[in-house]
């Protein structure tokens, strides 16, 4: 049985790489609507879109979503989630799942999975997902975040660099993945407890988070454990660029 949880979908209009991204149309609908529809297919008790832009509020209201207007000055999507959790009055132990607003094909099963994993691991303040890396180009791609975990499935660290660095194997050959090293790609979906979100904001960013531009490192820096599991179903990939948008359009529009 899936744990009770709320989904929050952060949707910013002013993306530096792709402004207006949540409202780009795919199969005749704004992208944020497709994300919302996928989240509504999960076991979530409630699905809320969080945005800092009135244009996105208007679009979300038009297709019937619950939407909250948040401040514009948040350092990260997790900071925005903390404001939403406070606005909704969620209990400290309530589970909140962050579904990125640029994942129009996110499988509902992985939304349920990340919530259930957090409920099953009270020692963790967060949970997230990963999948194996089977391509050496992905290992060296800084846009693909790598994760290493301990024997209990708790994150040791995340990095945009190859992680771990197979010293001898990569010194000899960087054209193939080192044999026997279980490289994993982080999938950017998270579940949190609402009380943790309050703590996360109060800590503020750390130098490691700022250096890698990875907000989950703030949690590790402050001693919070992050549970990581392999995704039951691999998400097909989000929309970071106009090229990604065209790829998703081809998939969904036929």
From Swiss-Prot:
Pathway: Nucleotide-sugar biosynthesis; CMP-3-deoxy-D-manno-octulosonate biosynthesis; CMP-3-deoxy-D-manno-octulosonate from 3-deoxy-D-manno-octulosonate and CTP: step 1/1; Bacterial outer membrane biogenesis; lipopolysaccharide biosynthesis. Gene3D superfamilies: Spore Coat Polysaccharide Biosynthesis Protein SpsA, Chain A (3.90.550.10). It comes from the Bacteria. It is an enzyme of class 2 (transferase). CDD domains: CMP-KDO-Synthetase. InterPro entries: Cytidylyl_trans (IPR003329), KdsB (IPR004528), Nucleotide-diphossugar_trans (IPR029044). Its EC number is 2.7.7.38. GO terms for cellular component: cytosol. GO terms for molecular function: 3-deoxy-manno-octulosonate cytidylyltransferase activity. GO terms for biological process: CMP-keto-3-deoxy-D-manno-octulosonic acid biosynthetic process; lipopolysaccharide biosynthetic process. Keywords: Cytoplasm, Lipopolysaccharide biosynthesis, Nucleotidyltransferase, Transferase. It holds the Pfam family CTP_transf_3. It catalyses: 3-deoxy-alpha-D-manno-oct-2-ulosonate + CTP = CMP-3-deoxy-beta-D-manno-octulosonate + diphosphate. It is found in: Cytoplasm. Activates KDO (a required 8-carbon sugar) for incorporation into bacterial lipopolysaccharide in Gram-negative bacteria. Belongs to the KdsB family. This is 3-deoxy-manno-octulosonate cytidylyltransferase.
């Amino acid at each position: 049985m899936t744990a009770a949880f709320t989904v929050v979908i952060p949707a910013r209009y002013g993306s530096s790489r792709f402004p207006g991204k949540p409202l780009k149309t795919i199969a005749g609908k704004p992208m944020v609507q497709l994300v919302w529809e996928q989240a509504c297919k999960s076991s979530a008790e409630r699905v809320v879109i969080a945005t800092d832009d009135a244009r996105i509020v208007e679009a979300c209201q038009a297709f019937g979503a619950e939407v909250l207007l948040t401040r514009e000055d948040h350092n990260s999507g997790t900071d925005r989630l903390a404001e939403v959790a406070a606005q909704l009055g969620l209990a400290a132990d309530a589970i909140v799942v962050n579904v990125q607003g640029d994942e129009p094909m996110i499988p509902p099963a992985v939304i349920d999975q990340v919530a259930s994993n957090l409920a099953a691991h009270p020692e963790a303040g967060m949970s997230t997902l990963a999948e194996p890396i089977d391509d050496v180009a992905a290992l060296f791609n800084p846009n693909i975040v790598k994760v290493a975990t301990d024997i209990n499935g708790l994150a040791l660290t995340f990095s945009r660099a190859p992680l771990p660095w197979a010293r001898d194997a990569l010194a000899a050959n960087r054209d193939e993945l080192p044999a026997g090293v279980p490289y994993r790609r982080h999938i950017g979906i998270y579940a949190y407890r609402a009380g943790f979100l309050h703590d996360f904001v109060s800590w503020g960013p750390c130098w490691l988070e700022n250096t890698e531009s990875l907000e989950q490192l703030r949690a590790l820096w402050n001693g919070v454990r992050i549970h990581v599991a392999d995704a039951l179903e691999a998400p097909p990939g989000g929309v970071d660029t106009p090229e990604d948008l065209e790829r998703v359009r081809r998939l969904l529009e036929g």
